[in-house]
Amino acid sequence: MADLKVGSTTGGSVIWHQGNFPLNPAGDDVLYKSFKIYSEYNKPQAADNDLVSKANGGTYLNRVIFNRGIQVPGAGNGLTGMFVGPGDGATYDNVNLDIISWYGIGFKSSQGTGPRTIVFNVRDGEISARGNINSQRQVRAEAAAPIAANDLTRKDYVDGAINTVTANANSRVLRSGDTMTGNLTAPNFFSQNPASQPSHVPRFDQIVIKDSVQDFGYY
């Protein structure tokens, strides 16, 4: 039987033994010195390597970059999540980030169990809000005319309506009295009171028709 000593070799390589390769069992684990050896049976856990667990979750303490996007499951069909846009811009054709939903996107406060306060219908672009919408600049509408009673109205539509009202007002005579800037023509004018001032238009019973014969009776 060979006499193994410190530094014994075989084929030029040092022979491993408990002295130079200390493996110690510890329950279901095997330790090299004081370090755990991972195996197919004893796989490393997320916490052992500062990883976020797929099953148990975790917290990233610094910025995380996703080159493609983030997809989350949601009700309905189709893709839901945040994804890189086609380019640098702020138009319908070109944006930096796309937030995609099958139908709607909602916003709600984490305080209590209150309802959603803002809802985006991403199918037709409708936005619903429970509170006021305050803007430091203009709110513009592309629709030429309002449809519903509570629709916002464009300035050009209001200006056109005002001009129509003004035109109608300027072309009409007020029942309460008015002053004409031009001629007033009508088939007949009826006066309930006889003329009493030089500027009044006399009634028929106050005038003598030219070339007519008047019977003033007997005196």
From Swiss-Prot:
KW Cytoplasm (keyword) present: no
GO cellular component, one term: virus tail, fiber
InterPro entries noted in UniProt: Tail_fibre_p36
UniProt subcellular location: Virion
Alphabetical UniProt keywords: Host-virus interaction, Viral attachment to host cell, Viral tail fiber protein, Viral tail protein, Virion, Virus entry into host cell
Pfam families reported in the protein's UniProt record: Phage_T4_gp36 (PF03903)
Signal peptide per UniProt: none
GO biological process annotation, one example: symbiont entry into host cell
Subunit structure, as described in the record: The distal half-fiber contains two molecules each of Gp36 and Gp37 and one molecule of Gp35.
Function statement: Structural component of the distal-half tail fiber.
Descriptive protein name: Tail fiber protein p36
Organism: Enterobacteria phage T2 (Bacteriophage T2)
Biological classification of the source: Viruses, Duplodnaviria, Heunggongvirae, Uroviricota, Caudoviricetes
